[in-house]
UniProtKB/Swiss-Prot annotation:
PANTHER family listed in its UniProt record: 10 KDA HEAT SHOCK PROTEIN, CO-CHAPERONIN GROES
Protein family (similarity comment): Belongs to the GroES chaperonin family.
A Pfam family reported for this protein in Swiss-Prot or TrEMBL: Cpn10
Keywords: Chaperone, Cytoplasm
Record has Cell inner membrane as a keyword: no
Name of protein: Co-chaperonin GroES
Organism of provenance: Alcanivorax borkumensis (strain ATCC 700651 / DSM 11573 / NCIMB 13689 / SK2)
Keyword Transferase (UniProt): no
Summary of the function given for this chain in its UniProt record: Together with the chaperonin GroEL, plays an essential role in assisting protein folding. The GroEL-GroES system forms a nano-cage that allows encapsulation of the non-native substrate proteins and provides a physical environment optimized to promote and accelerate protein folding. GroES binds to the apical surface of the GroEL ring, thereby capping the opening of the GroEL channel.
Subcellular location: Cytoplasm
């Protein structure tokens, strides 16, 4: 099964959770913060403007993005947890 986001929605795979604190303490699953970074897997066609034009998204598949801790909706696809969020919920694109 594959998912194709609609309009200005973006499908993101969250980075792996940190299992150790900065001081080297192993964190249990409930205490580990969910990362606010991830890889864009797929994007919608774009945002429909008031005059009916379609504005393409600024992010593309393969981009690494930073988003808010509570951004998006979690979906499970073939056993993998992914996030679907609006492009507006993305705070930045990580550039190397």
């Amino acid at each position: 099964m594959s998912i194709r986001p609609l309009h200005d929605r973006v499908l993101v795979r969250r980075e792996e959770e940190e299992t150790k604190s900065a001081g080297g303490i192993v964190l249990p699953g409930s205490a580990a913060e969910k990362p606010s970074r991830g890889e864009v897997i797929a994007v919608g066609n774009g945002k429909i403007t008031e005059n009916g034009d379609v504005r393409p998204l600024d992010v593309k598949a393969g981009d690494t993005v930073i988003f808010g801790q509570y951004s998006g909706s979690t979906v499970k696809v073939e056993g993998e947890e992914l996030l679907i969020m609006s492009e507006a919920e993305i705070l930045a694109v990580v550039e190397d």
